[in-house]
């Protein structure tokens, strides 16, 4: 038997009270659920005073103490006190703008309820409680914000500091059945990865990157689609998480995909935010929902030309306001080859924007002693990548490439065919501001928080 949904309505003073009352009666006539009452969120054009709504609406009404702001905190309080399942928004402009609606929706979803308005129904991510070990999730507020690089780094830090982690990864190129890659046991050479790609696998998928760069057990999973709130249409990560329970690990990292959120209950969370993202994608839409489910925000790409100081400060302020006490680290990425490349002539391919490639080249040459003879920022664009490879590959001894996108099926294949060595490149997050001097200390603190919650 399906449980009856407990519904809380949002009403305004821009409707005549009889009109709103009839709409509330329709809720029960349509058998949508049990109406627990309504929150008055503002507007005075068609009412004499807010108290009139309370007297005449015919249901329990909560009135805001402020007439100037949408009472988001009150809505959340009523959701929690009345065990509300659905918030039904019966308001309209000018009381609520589209921005207001997403602000309300983020708060409602964070409180565990659904948000409905006449032409949209948003559900929070349904987290499956299947893990039997302490765990943390790593999610992003968008694509290409450095989530997998931070995830691999987090796993390396936790492994080096004795937490014995494994990682469960959800990706758009993941396998039909969850796949275990024992990064702690097998040697993931370019030839090995190319052979896997020739079997039809996406051997540059995030779980292969994590296995190569972190050297820990990895479970690769797939997902399709990502909704506004981060829900997927299909995913096999629940099965993957159950597999993680059986691996020889004491801690589980669960990695999302793009802005999609893995539907696995964890004890703590880290959200990756790109300083180059539009502010409205972070503090607007359902960005705050993602931020609120985490304990630490790592803001990446905190340097020009990705973002100037003013933009970085705005992003940090936006994250802190959305996160309500969330800790923040500002960071930049720097490439680190996984092998010695001193004295080598290298072609460097990356997903980094073209504007920042020269800085990465300078870092590689100064820190690792190689000479970069050509670059391509087109690792995620196969046709352009092939053209760049044709242009520079004859001048190089080795190919330096991130392990993502077309790194294996195009870049590695062409390099090996041309007789070049292939060296994969890690992207290491380096703290440049915020609440911690080192990213590693920040992620370890989240791991400790996860353990405390798991044991508590």
From Swiss-Prot:
EC number: 6.5.1.9
Keyword check for Signal: no
Gene Ontology cellular-component terms listed: cytoplasm
Molecular-function GO term, any one: ATP binding
Chief localization: cytoplasm
Gene Ontology terms: biological process: gluconeogenesis
Catalytic activity: (2R)-2,3-bisphosphoglycerate + ATP + H(+) = cyclic (2R)-2,3-bisphosphoglycerate + ADP + phosphate
Entries under InterPro entries matching the protein: Cyc_diphosphoglycerate_synth (IPR016557), P-loop_NTPase (IPR027417)
Keyword tags: ATP-binding, Cytoplasm, Ligase, Nucleotide-binding
Subcellular localization(s) per the UniProt record: Cytoplasm
Family: Belongs to the cyclic 2,3-diphosphoglycerate synthetase family.
Function, as annotated: Catalyzes the formation of cyclic 2,3-diphosphoglycerate (cDPG) by formation of an intramolecular phosphoanhydride bond at the expense of ATP.
Protein name (record): Cyclic 2,3-diphosphoglycerate synthetase
Gene for this chain: cpgS
């Amino acid at each position: 038997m399906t449980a009856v949904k407990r519904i809380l309505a949002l009403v305004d003073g821009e409707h005549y009270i009889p009109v709103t009352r009839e709409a509330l009666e329709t809720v029960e006539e349509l058998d949508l659920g049990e109406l627990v009452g309504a929150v008055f969120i503002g507007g005075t054009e068609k009412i004499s005073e807010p108290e009139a709504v309370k007297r005449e609406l015919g249901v329990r009404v909560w009135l805001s103490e402020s007439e100037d702001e949408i009472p988001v905190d009150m809505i959340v309080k009523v959701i929690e006190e009345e065990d509300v399942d659905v918030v039904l928004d019966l308001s309209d402009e000018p009381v609520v703008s589209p921005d207001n609606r997403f602000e309300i929706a983020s708060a409602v979803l964070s409180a565990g309820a659904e948000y409905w308005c006449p032409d949209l129904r948003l559900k929070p991510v349904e987290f499956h409680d299947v893990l039997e070990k302490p765990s943390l999730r790593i999610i992003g507020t968008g694509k290409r914000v450095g989530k997998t690089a931070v995830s691999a780094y987090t796993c390396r830090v936790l492994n080096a500091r004795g937490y014995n982690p494994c990682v469960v990864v959800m990706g758009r190129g993941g396998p039909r059945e969850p796949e275990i890659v024992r990064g702690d046991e097998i040697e993931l050479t370019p030839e090995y990865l190319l052979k896997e790609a020739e079997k039809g696998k996406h051997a540059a998928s995030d779980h292969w990157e994590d296995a190569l760069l972190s050297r820990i057990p990895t479970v690769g999973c797939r997902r399709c689609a990502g909704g506004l709130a981060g829900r997927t249409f299909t995913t096999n990560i629940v099965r993957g998480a159950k597999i993680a329970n059986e691996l020889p690990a004491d801690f589980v990292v669960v990695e999302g995909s793009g802005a999609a959120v893995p539907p696995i209950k964890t004890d703590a969370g880290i959200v990756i935010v790109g300083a180059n993202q539009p502010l409205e994608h972070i503090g607007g839409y359902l960005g705050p929902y993602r931020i609120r489910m985490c304990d630490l925000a790592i803001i990446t790409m905190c340097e020009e030309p990705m973002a100037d100081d003013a933009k970085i400060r705005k992003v940090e302020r936006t994250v802190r306001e959305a996160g309500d006490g969330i800790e923040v680290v500002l960071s930049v990425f720097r490439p680190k080859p996984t092998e010695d490349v001193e004295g080598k002539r290298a072609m460097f391919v990356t997903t980094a924007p073209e504007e920042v490639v020269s800085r990465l080249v300078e870092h590689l040459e100064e820190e690792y002693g190689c000479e970069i003879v050509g670059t391509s920022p087109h690792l995620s664009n196969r046709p352009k990548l092939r053209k760049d490879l044709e242009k520079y590959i004859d001048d190089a001894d080795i190919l330096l490439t991130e392990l993502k996108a077309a790194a294996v099926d195009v870049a590695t294949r062409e390099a090996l065919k041309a007789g070049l060595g292939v060296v994969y490149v890690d992207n290491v997050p380096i703290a440049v501001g915020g609440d911690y001097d080192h990213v590693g200390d920040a992620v370890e603190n989240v791991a400790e928080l996860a353990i405390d919650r798991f044991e508590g």
